[in-house]
Structures are given as C-alpha cells and as structure tokens.
C-alpha cells in the first residue's frame, strides 16, 4: 500500500503513477483527495516481490522529485476481511461541535463495527448560517450484530 501526502499541484498524480509504472508496479485500487491544499494518495500497488522492493528502495527518489511524504506498507489481499460482516451506509448532520467524529467512532468501536470509509464536511445552514457538520460513512457491521431496521 503506497500512501503519500503533499502540497497539491497539477501533475502530482501523473508523477506518482509514473514512478510506480516505471518500476513495474500496477495500481489496483486508489483513493485520492485534495483537502485544504494538501493532496492525499492511497494506492494498492501490485507487483512481484522484486518490484515492490524496487519501489520501496526508490521512495527517496519519489520524495525528492515530488516533495511529498510517501511510504510503502504491506496490505491484506483484496477482499480480505477479518470477520463476516455486512456493509451499511451511515449518514448524519448536526450542528457542529468539537468531538463529533470521536463520539461516533467510539460508539462504532464499542459495537465492534469497522469504518470502511468516512467523509466529513462542514457546511453552512441555509437560513441561519450556523455551521452544520455532515458525515457519510460506509461501515462493516459484524453479521452476528442485530441491526434495527425502520
């Protein structure tokens, strides 16, 4: 798994993908986003042990060429799951206050629910202008957990 973060600019994805391709690697899955001027990259890289070693050995070259902080770490094979689970989407909006992500994450952890993806944004209420916190999650609920349905 290649993870990288750095100042956003045009061409960054091309440079990182070229780095991987030039060393024989293949990008299987990826998530990338610009947040407040910082561009974050998460890529599942496929390749032989020699290819992955070459990518690891050359990370300093990538860092120097792109000014991003990058590292390669082992990852589970695609579709690997520690336990049988069911996917659910969880969305919510509330008046903004400190600690909302922690509170939701704490409840989910106590239920042994894994957060697969989470996106949060701060919006402005249309009439009052008050800050509204919005979150959208995909979670993996253990198959043995009883879920209330409307």
Stretches found by the model and what they are:
Residues 1-150:
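A conserved regulatory-domain signal marking ACT and ACT-like small-molecule sensing domains
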């Amino acid at each position: 798994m290649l993870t990288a973060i750095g100042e956003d600019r045009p061409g960054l994805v091309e440079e990182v993908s070229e780095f991987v391709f030039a060393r024989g690697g293949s990008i299987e899955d990826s998530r990338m986003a610009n947040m407040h001027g910082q561009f974050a990259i998460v890529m599942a890289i496929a390749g032989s042990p020699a290819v992955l070693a070459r990518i690891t050995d050359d990370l300093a070259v990538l860092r120097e060429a792109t000014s991003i902080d990058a590292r390669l770490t082992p990852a589970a094979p695609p579709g690997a799951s520690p336990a049988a689970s069911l996917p659910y989407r969880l969305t919510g909006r509330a008046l903004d206050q400190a600690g909302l992500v922690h509170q939701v994450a704490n409840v989910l952890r106590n239920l042994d629910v894994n957060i697969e993806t989470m996106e949060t944004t701060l919006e402005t209420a249309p009439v009052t202008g008050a800050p509204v916190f919005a979150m959208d999650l995909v979670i993996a609920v253990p198959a043995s957990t009883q879920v209330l349905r409307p």
